[in-house]
Amino acid sequence: MIGQLTGLVGQIEGERCIVDVNGVGYVVSASTRTLAVLPQPPSVARVLIETIVREDAIQLFGFATTDERDWFRLLTTVQSVGAKVALAILSANNPGELLLAINAGDKGSLTRAAGVGPRLADRILSELRNKVAKMPGGGGTVSAPGIVSGPSVENDALLALAGLGFRRAEAWPVLSKVLAENENATLDLAIRLSLKDLAR
């Protein structure tokens, strides 16, 4: 199972994007919220992945936060809520709004999503009311390249550079220098500056 992809963001179109990892382009479906925070191609990003295996296909669904991924998993436990409807709900409501809507029995917030009518909204409220106490309310760990420098940026940048064909032994000294000179570098900036030095 694929749980995360770190690679170059390729084409973003409709409700999906392509993430290029070491020359292999993975088609990832995502909510409009996740697609909106992805950097413009051909920048590097880390995307959390939920893999769904069916008889005729393997589908990858991407998320910018752990909260959004957890809500996707919870929503798809509801009868008649498939992956497409779950993404539509997450496009219409962020995790915090979903938590408030379900606790308040707010059917209108759910019916804003494509494919969710009053009857399905009632079912979602009924089935999830007792489950949302354990759900996150909208914080979470952003897994796009806006995180400032630290262990996460360092590790993700090394993984991305390895995915682009660079050995750790050659990438690590360059990346260390980049992060030392750019303390607040984002993941995308750290990788771009490292690639610039490695290409010399």
UniProtKB/Swiss-Prot annotation:
A GO cellular component annotation in the UniProt record: Holliday junction resolvase complex
Can you say where in the cell this protein is located? Answer: Cytoplasm
Which is one GO molecular function term here? Answer: four-way junction helicase activity
- Identify the keywords attached in UniProt to this record, alphabetized: Cytoplasm, DNA damage, DNA recombination, DNA repair, DNA-binding
Q: Which Gene3D superfamilies would you find in this protein's record? A: 5' to 3' exonuclease, C-terminal subdomain, DNA helicase RuvA subunit, C-terminal domain, Nucleic acid-binding proteins
Location of the region described as Flexible linker in the Swiss-Prot/TrEMBL record: 144-148
Where is the region Domain I? 1-64
The record's region (Domain III) falls at 149-200
Major site of localization recorded for this protein: cytoplasm
- Tell me if 4Fe-4S is a UniProt keyword of this record: no
| CDD domains per record | UBA_RuvA_C
Q: Which Pfam families match?
A: HHH_5, RuvA_C, RuvA_N
| One of the protein's GO biological processes | DNA repair
Report which superkingdom the organism of origin falls in. Bacteria
Annotated region Domain II: the residues are 65-143
Q: What does this protein do?
A: The RuvA-RuvB-RuvC complex processes Holliday junction (HJ) DNA during genetic recombination and DNA repair, while the RuvA-RuvB complex plays an important role in the rescue of blocked DNA replication forks via replication fork reversal (RFR). RuvA specifically binds to HJ cruciform DNA, conferring on it an open structure. The RuvB hexamer acts as an ATP-dependent pump, pulling dsDNA into and through the RuvAB complex. HJ branch migration allows RuvC to scan DNA until it finds its consensus sequence, where it cleaves and resolves the cruciform DNA.
What the entry says about domains is:
Has three domains with a flexible linker between the domains II and III and assumes an 'L' shape. Domain III is highly mobile and contacts RuvB.
| Family that this chain belongs to | Belongs to the RuvA family.
Q: What's the subunit arrangement here?
A: Homotetramer. Forms an RuvA(8)-RuvB(12)-Holliday junction (HJ) complex. HJ DNA is sandwiched between 2 RuvA tetramers; dsDNA enters through RuvA and exits via RuvB. An RuvB hexamer assembles on each DNA strand where it exits the tetramer. Each RuvB hexamer is contacted by two RuvA subunits (via domain III) on 2 adjacent RuvB subunits; this complex drives branch migration. In the full resolvosome a probable DNA-RuvA(4)-RuvB(12)-RuvC(2) complex forms which resolves the HJ.
This protein is called Holliday junction branch migration complex subunit RuvA
The protein's organism comes out as: Gluconobacter oxydans (strain 621H)
